[in-house]
Regions:
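Amphipathic alpha-helical segments enriched in hydrophobic/aromatic and basic residues
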Residues: 26, 35-36, 57, 61-68, ...
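Hydrophobic alpha-helical connector segments
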Residues: 77-106, 143-144, 153-156
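Helix-turn-helix
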Residues: 17, 21, 25-59
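Amphipathic C-terminal alpha-helical segment
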Residues: 103, 110, 157-175, 189-197
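Amphipathic alpha-helical linker/stalk segments
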Residues: 66-90, 123, 132-135, 139-140
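N-terminal intrinsically disordered/low-complexity leader segments
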Residues: 1-13, 195-197
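Amphipathic alpha-helical packing segments from all-alpha helical-bundle domains
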Residues: 100, 118-143, 150-154, 180-191
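Generic hydrophobic, amphipathic alpha-helix propensity
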Residues: 11-22, 39, 64-68, 72, ...
């Protein structure tokens, strides 16, 4: 039994090493620099060993995408818990979303397809941020029809993700200006939620 446990631990450790190596390569070279051979070289294995754990590069991207959505969800939950009202929660959550995008730019890129194709396999974890935001929007608006909440979510997402994407690609606006644009957008949309409620 101990031998089976050890083998399972070693397999999980190798799997984690593959994902960590992939992420390190992406941090150094970008997503276009990632391939199975580089991962194998990084962890000192042969490429066929990598394929025992992940069928292809997309499978690795999918796992990293899941990781990103789990991390983002946790940051959004924390932001929501720190707020005194649904309106404040919404503001803190979108600010946390913004902060996450720049603190882990590479994962954000694969999660949302910025300067690359996002992961083709949908992961259930991608729904968690959406649910957190729509639940909070619904609270602010007094529980309107789901279609209205969905529309308001995508209004927020379109503006904030668009601003993030522009900054990742690089437009050279000063940080202070970006922050003011972000805060103006968030407060404007929150105001529209309260008016519509």
């Amino acid at each position: 039994m101990a031998s089976k446990d050890r083998i399972l631990r070693q397999k999980e450790e190798t799997r984690c090493n593959i994902l960590n190596a992939a992420y390190d390569i992406v941090k150094e070279e970008g997503w276009l620099g990632l391939n199975m051979r580089k991962i194998a070289d990084r962890i000192e294995y042969t490429a066929p060993i990598i394929y025992e754990y992940f069928s292809n590069k997309d499978a690795i991207l999918n796992e990293l995408t899941k990781k990103g959505f789990l991390e983002l969800t946790q940051k959004l939950k924390t932001a929501k818990e720190e707020a005194a009202s649904p309106e404040e929660a919404l503001e803190k959550m979108w600010l946390a979303f913004w902060d996450y995008a720049f603190s882990d730019k590479e994962l954000y890129q694969v999660m949302f397809g910025v300067e690359m194709t996002c992961c083709l396999m949908q992961c259930a974890e991608a729904e968690n941020p959406y649910r957190l935001f729509t639940d909070t929007i619904s609270e602010v608006m007094g529980n309107p029809a789901h279609e209205i909440v969905k529309q308001k979510y995508f209004t927020f997402f379109s503006i904030i993700h668009g601003l993030i994407s522009i900054n990742i690609i690089g437009n050279g606006l000063p940080v202070e200006m970006n922050t003011q644009i972000l805060r103006d957008a968030i407060s404007g949309i929150i105001h529209s939620l309260k008016v519509a409620a």
